[in-house]
């Protein structure tokens, strides 16, 4: 379970890096949760 969480966190960072260049700041902000809970909703 922990490995899956780490994988999702890394995927979120990669998506964030792409979206910050291509999409609106709002979308990028949604992929940058301070406590990591938003990952459940994104994936």
From Swiss-Prot:
**What compartments host this protein?**
Secreted
Alphabetic keyword roster? Secreted, Signal
**What species was this sequence derived from?**
Homo sapiens
> What does the record's miscellaneous section state?
The ancestral BAGE gene was generated by juxtacentromeric reshuffling of the KMT2C/MLL3 gene. The BAGE family was expanded by juxtacentromeric movement and/or acrocentric exchanges. BAGE family is composed of expressed genes that map to the juxtacentromeric regions of chromosomes 13 and 21 and of unexpressed gene fragments that scattered in the juxtacentromeric regions of several chromosomes, including chromosomes 9, 13, 18 and 21.
Name of the protein this chain belongs to: B melanoma antigen 5
**Chain's role:** Unknown. Candidate gene encoding tumor antigens.
Q: Does the keyword Signal apply?
A: yes
The residues forming the signal peptide are 1-17
Can you tell which superkingdom this protein's organism belongs to?
Eukaryota
Tell me its family: Belongs to the BAGE family.
> What cellular component GO annotations does this protein have?
extracellular region
| Statement: the UniProt record of this protein carries the keyword Iron | no
Q: Provide the tissue specificity.
A: Not expressed in normal tissues except in testis. Expressed in melanoma, bladder and lung carcinomas.
Q: Which InterPro entries has this protein been placed in? A: BAGE-like (IPR012530)
Q: State where it is primarily located.
A: secreted
């Amino acid at each position: 379970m922990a490995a899956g969480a780490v994988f999702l966190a890394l995927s979120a960072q990669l998506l964030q890096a792409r979206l910050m260049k291509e999409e609106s700041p709002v979308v990028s902000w949604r992929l940058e949760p301070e406590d990591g809970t938003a990952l459940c909703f994104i994936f």
